[in-house]
């Protein structure tokens, strides 16, 4: 059963197009729910009504086309290493190559009030833009035809609440702000939408 499910996830990574999209964010239905609590002073059961977020009935909110692979600049090797430690298969380009990819342009960024591993949490809104780029040797390539594809999308799609952008590991800023190397308005992750042969070498997860 587990092996069959993993094989299905890998096969979907090779199947691009309609019906095989990436769900980035979801919305849940809010409902009233009655809960029985213990009244602290008397110790008697008390029924209260609460707002209940029904995550089991969550509906897709932001959906994007399923990419063939994600690409990440070699300067973010520490982020790539985090992915490989989680079991994600990664490769690196052996030589520079020009590719047509989808890039994320940050339209809005709101900084949170909490820290995660010394990073401020972010909530971002992006738009996807098609462009041709030269990717240098050492660029990380994360194919979606692997068992960890679902986790990979959660980690790399910027709007995902659990993404590296949301957690502050990939610094970004809103488009139109003063450009900064530390916080660019273009997310340093790119979506390769067509199957291509790339000259790559495997990345050692150690």
Question: Where does each model-flagged region fall?
Answer:
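Short, charged low-complexity intrinsically disordered segments located at boundaries
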Residues: 7-28, 110-116, 171-174, 188-192, ...
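A short linear-motif detector with a strong N-terminal bias
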Residues: 48-51, 118-122, 177-178
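Short, hydrophobic/proline-enriched secondary-structure or compact coil segments at domain edges
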Residues: 70-74, 138-146
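Accessory, solvent-exposed terminal regions and/or long lumenal/extracellular loops of proteins
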Residues: 147-152, 156-206
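Hard-cation-handling environments
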Residues: 1-101
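Substrate-recognition/cap regions that form aromatic- and gly/pro-loop-enriched pockets
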Residues: 58, 63, 80-139, 143
